[in-house]
């Protein structure tokens, strides 16, 4: 097995940082009223600023694959570009189309002359790490030598007020029942947008830092634990 290194990292955040006081200017107010749970949620999550791929009229400014491509392009330089990468592994929990897959959308927007292996991963929280593990295994096996793992999310489009019914969980119930922490209002003040990418290679940098990647371990507990985050269905446990 060959050694594996992360030799470059990058990120892309859309637009300007959004202050907590501005959140509902971007997402809108459900029923035209400020959220009663907002301050409680923000006090507990301690998020101070975030980024949205939206303007204050709730118009989308970037797609998830736009942001992914920008983060990948930030890896370029010193013979690294869309024509020298031989594997693209992409992860997201907020894919914008059923088909084609997230990774293929990104590859199409990258352009270039290089045909390459592309894989896509989906799922809450860990899809980007799945992409990283795939790159690690491909480089370790000797099948690939320059791989990019990228993750991007655009949850703000899901969180716009226009997509929510005019219904609120009471503040007292939010404080009494921790499972309400996964309901609608909670997610509006937790999730935001952005992308990050890493270059995974079989050789360390000649100059600069490299991170040797020895293992990535992933374990699902879905067989014993209840679902905590879901989309696209009514979940009845």
Predicted regions and their residues:
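Short, flexible helix-coil linker/hinge segments at the edges of structured domains or between repeats
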Residues: 158-180
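Short glycine-rich or small-residue beta-strand-to-loop segments that form or flank ligand, phosphate
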Residues: 86-94
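Short acidic, glycine/serine/threonine-rich loops at helix termini
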Residues: 18, 99-101, 133, 158-163, ...
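Acyl-CoA/ACP chain-elongation machinery
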Residues: 143-165, 221-228
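Short beta-strand segments
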Residues: 7-8, 91, 122, 147-153, ...
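Condensing-enzyme catalytic core mediating Claisen C-C bond formation in acyl metabolism
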Residues: 1-61, 174-237
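Conserved catalytic cysteine-centered active-site region
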Residues: 38, 42-52, 60-65, 93-146
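Phosphate/pyrophosphate-binding loops at sites that engage ATP/ADP/AMP, CoA/4′-phosphopantetheine
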Residues: 71-86
């Amino acid at each position: 097995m060959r050694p594996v290194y992360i030799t470059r990292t990058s990120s892309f955040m859309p637009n300007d940082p959004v202050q907590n006081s501005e959140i509902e200017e971007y997402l809108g107010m459900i029923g035209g009223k400020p959220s009663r749970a907002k301050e409680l949620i923000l006090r507990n999550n301690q998020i101070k600023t975030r980024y949205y791929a939206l303007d204050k009229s709730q118009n989308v400014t970037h797609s998830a694959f736009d942001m992914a491509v920008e983060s990948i392009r930030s890896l370029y330089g010193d013979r690294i570009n869309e024509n020298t990468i031989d594997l693209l592994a992409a992860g997201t929990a907020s894919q914008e189309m059923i088909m084609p897959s997230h990774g293929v959308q990104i590859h199409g927007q990258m352009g270039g002359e290089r045909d390459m292996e592309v894989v896509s991963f989906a799922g809450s929280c860990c899809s980007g790490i799945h992409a990283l593990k795939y790159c690690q295994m491909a480089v370790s096996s000797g099948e690939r030598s320059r791989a990019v793992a990228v993750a991007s999310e655009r949850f703000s489009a899901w969180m716009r007020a226009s997509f929510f019914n005019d219904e609120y969980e009471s503040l007292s119930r939010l404080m009494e029942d921790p499972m309400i922490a996964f309901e609608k209002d909670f997610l509006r003040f937790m999730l935001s947008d952005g992308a990050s990418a890493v270059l995974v290679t079989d050789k360390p940098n000649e100059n600069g830092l490299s991170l040797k990647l020895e293992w990535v371990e992933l374990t699902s507990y879905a067989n014993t634990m209840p679902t905590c985050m879901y989309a696209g269905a009514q979940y009845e446990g």
